[in-house]
From Swiss-Prot:
HAMAP family from the UniProt entry: RecR
UniProt protein name: Recombination protein RecR
Keyword set, alphabetical order: DNA damage, DNA recombination, DNA repair, Metal-binding, Zinc, Zinc-finger
Domain Toprim, chain residue ranges per copy: 86-181
Gene coding for it: recR
Zinc finger (C4-type) boundaries: 63-78
Keyword DNA damage among record annotations: yes
Length: 204
């Protein structure tokens, strides 16, 4: 049970604390605060939260082209005629797309891998959307692939693997500049730092 509430907390409350505690970035104390806030809140607020979660699960899908989250397929970025279809920025997660869009620097398309290569965690290239990326590169007029994986061991390993696969196709491959701290995640970078990393990208 959650955070030592086995005997003093009613089971429905303890179960919800457990569920919040399973979410990334939410520890036992934060989970408890959220649940006890909802206990004090009006019923309508709890219902709105529950309905929003279910609506998100029911209506959100992955774009069949770039694998970003969307409510329509293909997504609005892939169907935007003003985007530069000759550039593709490869990221690990949908949150990285949000971070890069906030910079206002990138006007091309995206490809979301949904993870990074990590032998320790048992994540291999075939577990990611790499096969789909290579298929896109063979049929779309892409001239540059910007590898925007996180600046950590897993991100670097993924970028190196992708570069080995893509360069023989005759496509330019670049990597974000090292303005980002080692071990950080793109989603937490501020817009200025991320924008400069994009502008200063280097050849691989």
């Amino acid at each position: 049970m959650a955070f030592g509430y086995d005997t003093i907390t009613p089971e429905p409350v303890a179960k919800l604390i457990d569920e919040f505690n399973r979410l990334p970035g939410i520890g036992p104390k934060s989970a408890s605060r959220l649940v006890f806030y909802l206990l004090r809140a009006k019923r309508e607020q709890s219902e709105r939260l529950a309905n929003a979660i279910m609506a998100m699960k029911d209506s959100t899908i992955f774009c069949n082209r770039c694998f970003n989250i969307t409510v329509e397929d293909p997504c609005t970025i892939c169907t935007n005629a003003n985007r530069n279809e000759r550039q593709v920025c490869v990221v690990e997660e949908p949150l990285d797309v949000v971070a890069l869009e906030r910079t206002g620097e990138f006007k091309g398309l995206y490809h979301v891998l949904h993870g990074a290569i990590s032998p320790v965690e048992g994540i291999n290239p075939e577990d990611l959307r790499i096969r789909e990326l290579l298929a896109r590169l063979r049929v779309e007029p892409i001239e540059e692939v910007i590898l925007s994986t996180n600046p950590n061991l897993e991100g670097d390993a993924t970028a190196a693997y992708l570069a080995r696969e893509i360069i023989p196709l005759g496509i330019r491959v670049t990597r974000l500049a090292r303005g980002l701290p080692m071990g950080s995640d793109l989603e937490y970078a501020d817009e200025v730092t991320l924008g400069r990393a994009l502008q200063g990208r280097r050849e691989m």
